[in-house]
Regions:
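Unchanged
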Residues: 1-259, 366-378, 383-384, 413-425
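Left-handed beta-helix
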Residues: 1-5, 199, 206-425
Length: 425
């Protein structure tokens, strides 16, 4: 068998991203001024010479499907290979939906068997990193592994968020614990990057599908089972930058890392291009008297006010006297004259009225609807929300998608919630 094939798991809900993923799949969330999160994984594939890719979608797939399309930005619009969007095809039973990451691959076994690949790469579509998968393939073959898991070392206080692997000196995995409470098992976290021998993967998936007690998930079921019975599972230590942006705080921090003088990844590297789907936009316009400091400003933006340590996506307008500070502002949003944003994340097509203040005060009361996700001082505003002139919005507030100006009856206190209608994408 020849060739290479990759599955990208892109159907997760991403509830910890709050409003940003309520109406779109997590891999479709915008990132870094012009990209979407899945662009990193797709670009890693083509930059590594993998041009046959299946993207498994399920939750709110519309934005993701529209973004990927036929794969032209990634040179994946091909007669042979290319990109295929693989959605579940449910019948009358709800069990036809993908029940877990392993089940998602199992339901596409026929698709896999048609591929002439000796190994199968299975990737998460919601992480920020740049990896040459050729190095992973070489490690896998050198160790005669059946499964190789890419791992990275995480801080001790974050081990409970990841699957943690224990290894021997040669990388052979001797133990695996899914989201342990302590770092007793070490700090080597699974990156959600798996390289399987094709035939072994097929056999293991069929075996797992027959187990009624299994949740059919790679991290919860398959990987622990394979390690426990001594299969040739190896861990490849990835030395580069890798970020799981699955929470509002991690998403916010990762975006702002890219405005620093030395960002964690070189997004302008001609040897490792980060491809994406982009619309034609005019150049950035910076008016006389405007001030832009340490920020990413995408095409089509017009800045007449002040932008500090922020990320502006295409088409954002910052009027005279407006201040955008430590914030992420998505496509075609208007920040009107005299308005101020501080530690805020605004989704697409938001309108912030004159003199409004979004993210203000010292009160750090956690959000009353999602305190576990919104407690560090960030304000999140949903797509197409309309914030009226002069409104004051406290820290940790959540303003829903498509909220109208008349939906606000008073200032929004710290931790406050203003909900909008459903059905926005």
């Amino acid at each position: 068998m020849t060739g290479r094939y990759a599955f990208i798991l892109a159907g997760g809900v991403g509830s910890r991203l709050c409003l940003l993923s309520e109406r779109r799949a997590k891999p479709a969330v915008p990132f870094g001024g012009k990209y979407r999160i899945i662009d990193f994984t797709l670009s890693n594939c083509v930059n590594s010479g993998i041009f046959d890719v299946g993207v498994l979608t399920q939750y709110r797939p519309t934005s993701l499907n529209q973004h990927i399309g036929i794969g032209r930005p990634w040179d994946l619009d091909r007669t042979r290979g290319g990109v295929q969007l693989l959605q579940p095809a449910p019948g009358l039973a709800t069990s036809d939906w993908y029940q877990g990451t392993a089940d998602a691959i199992y339901q596409n076994l026929l698709h896999l068997k048609r591929r002439r690949a000796q190994e199968v790469l299975i990737l998460s579509g919601d992480h920020v990193y740049q990896m040459d998968y050729n190095v992973l393939y070489a490690f896998h073959r050198r160790n005669h592994a059946r499964l190789t898991v890419a791992v990275t070392e995480v801080p001790e206080n974050e081990v409970s968020q990841f699957g943690i692997l224990e290894t021997e000196a040669n990388g052979h995995v001797v133990a695996f614990k899914e989201k342990p409470k302590t770092a007793a098992s070490g700090r080597l976290a699974s990156m959600g990057v798996y390289l399987f021998d094709r035939d072994a993967l097929i056999r293991w998936l069929v075996e797992d599908a027959a187990m009624s007690h299994s949740s059919h998930d790679f991290g919860k079921d398959l990987l622990p089972r394979l390690v426990a019975r001594g299969e040739a599972v190896y861990a490849y230590r990835f030395p580069g930058y890798w970020q799981d942006v699955g929470t509002l705080d991690s998403y916010y921090r990762a975006n702002l890392e890219f405005v620093q003088p030395k960002p964690p990844l070189d997004l302008s590297d001609p040897e490792w291009v980060l491809h994406t789907q982009t619309a034609d936009r005019p150049p950035v316009r910076v008016a006389a008297g405007a001030k832009v400091t340490r920020s990413l400003v995408a095409n089509g933006c017009s800045v007449s006010g002040e932008v500090v340590n922020s990320v502006l996506f295409p088409g954002v307008v910052v009027e005279k006297g407006a201040v955008v500070r430590d914030s992420i502002v998505m496509h075609d949003t208007l920040v009107a004259a005299g308005a101020e944003l501080d530690h805020a994340i605004l989704d697409k097509e938001v309108r912030v009225g004159r003199g409004a203040k979004v993210g203000t005060g010292d009160d750090m009361t956690p959000n009353r609807a999602c305190p576990e996700h919104l407690s560090s001082g960030l304000v999140v505003v949903g797509k197409q929300a309309r914030i009226p002139a002069g409104l004051v919005v406290g820290r940790n507030a959540r303003i829903g998608a498509a909220v109208a100006a008349e939906d606000f009856t008073a200032p929004v206190p710290a931790g406050g919630v203003v909900d909008g209608p459903e059905s926005m994408h």
